[in-house]
């Protein structure tokens, strides 16, 4: 299982999701993508994205205005 980090801080919707989708397309089942985002809608966007695509949102947290979203490839 591999893990990668994607920094999309400063980007607004829909760019964080689009960049994550592109990164996940290069990953294998079970791999984990950690996304760093500052868009306030990111947690809800990633929850919906995972629900629609079958990926798993393992964790969503916020510290000092930066959201950390951990997504496992389906």
UniProtKB/Swiss-Prot annotation:
InterPro entries: TusA-like, TusA-like_sf. The active site is at 13 (cysteine persulfide intermediate). Transmembrane segments: none annotated. Disulfide bonds: none annotated. It comes from the Bacteria. Belongs to the sulfur carrier protein TusA family. This is Putative sulfur carrier protein NMB0681.
